[in-house]
Amino acid sequence: MAIVKMKRLQVLALERDHDAILRRLQHMGCLEISEPDTEALPDTLRRCDAATADCLARQRQLQTAMDTLRRTAPPPKAGLLTPRPRISERDYLDEASLAAELETAQRINELSADINRLTAKETQLRSEQAALRPWRSLDVPLELTETRWCDITTGTLPPFAHWDEVQGALASQIPEAEAYLLYADREQQCLLLLTHKTVTAAALELLRSFGFAGGQLKGRRGTPEENLTALDDALRQTAAEKENARQALAALGDKLPDLQLCSDRLSSRLMREENRKRLLTDGCIVAFDGWVPAVKLPKLAAWLDTLDCAYDVSDPTAKEIPNVPVQLHGNVLTRSMNCITEQYSMPAYDGVDPNPIMAPFFIFFFGMMMADMGYGLAMIVGSLLFLKKKRPANRSFMEMIFWCGIMTFIFGALTGGFLGDFIPQLCKLIDPASTVALPSLFDPLNDTMAIMVGSLVLGGIQVFTGMAVSVVEKCRNGHFPDALFDEITWWIILAGGAMALLGVGSVGGVPVVLCIGGVMLLYGAGRGKKGFGKVTGVVAAVYNGVTGFFSDILSYVRLMALMLSGAVLAQVFNMLGATTGNIVTFVIISLVGNTLNLALNLLGCYVHDMRLQFLEFFGRFYKDGGKAFRPLCMQSNYVEIVKEEHE
């Protein structure tokens, strides 16, 4: 179980075959095509044309259609364990079906746009109705604004304008003008103004002093009542069109699975087009290079031998090492740690795969913190059901829960915990004289000190393991002096300190081993430095080494703390249920409380376990910065593709 060895593959093929090559590579899913160095390209080569923009546009169109269906015709909610539908690779790559699904998406988007347009039209028509209703009593055509001798003007006054004052001002100052109040509410007063043409301007000027505003009905023809009738007809027609569009959209509600399949097909096509841009061509040939796992190379090479192409395989050079993609290989136990490692950072290609070393510690610590047979059984059964029924594409997280569930059950058996003290409390409710208790090796509540010491010992073991891995890696890379003075020196110092405390290994009262470690520390901390830098180097090495080592060890006290808190909470919920004196109520309260405790502990143990790995363990040896292996393959989010062997 280690980082998969990669080979660099360089291919030169005929341009007419490049599409078939890309499709077969996508089927095989074992080659990551590298991005070409465009600055070093000769003038005769260029990138292959790719339809990425078209794929992205279609993907957006499809996503809009799916969002519309989920909003307007939501499908039945799928169960938690409902698996993705399976589809053969041949059907998955059916271009005719893809075209039909894209037409369906376009139709859905058109209907959605029609509904939005008609909704906006309804809003506009209702707004026009609201503006015309105050003028309903006006029986004069709105296009009639003047006669031979008179001007006809409509307008509004603010609600605070006193109508009697307006009429009085007109009568006293402009007797050739007459105003009629048609409607009044809290927002406005609507009026009709009749004036002799010679005094129209003066009358309007007078009314403006009261806040008059005109022009609300400008551009309309017919009476307000006729306009309102026409608006009612338009609203009914718009509502009918909108309902027809809604029904047509609802009829397409069962197309969501087809659109989801289409989305997956487009994702695979987009990935193929993005990789097509990495191919170089001069119009006659195409050239590309990439990375392939060494174990997959024979099958890929056998297929390349059947083509009219030339290819070359080589190991990555020292200059290429930082750019080599990383793929982790593990067994059924260690691959469950992939979800943990990927959250931190992929290891460098020339680093070490942490999963085989981390897996025992992570699972052991998780089980120790949870430590309950009931919780362990729930984790085991839940993860197995999810893996079997759901068939997730990424299984590592649920596999991790499964292994942690087994260890949780084991520690629960050691501590005698089954949903806390559920069984003893239940037995006491049935028979108050009951003394039933599950057998246990130790009790988290009564053996706190022993558990704390055990946590520190386990922390020391993991920290020393990380240091040992660092020593091996440094020696393998030819950096033995670094291993000697950075890790082995501290082993000697710690061993010498322990021997001195036990009174072992001293000569004439002098702790020899401790003194040897001290000399090595003084020499190693000052190596490569001159003058006063040696002094500061020694001081920094001693301070950082002592504080760093012991603070890392102390961090493992959280193992005891999480175990204790989980056990206490479980017992508290059981105690609350037992106070009712009713078995049914006790079971309900206990199960609800323990469910909450399980959820809380799952999150807490997961986070704290990761923290121990990332900070205390990885900090000792881990070299990160790797780039995950991303081969050209068929991507799917909604369906499960059943691979078929090509002849």
Protein language model annotation of sequence segments:
Residues M1-M358, N394-M398:
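Long, charged N-terminal accessory/stalk domains
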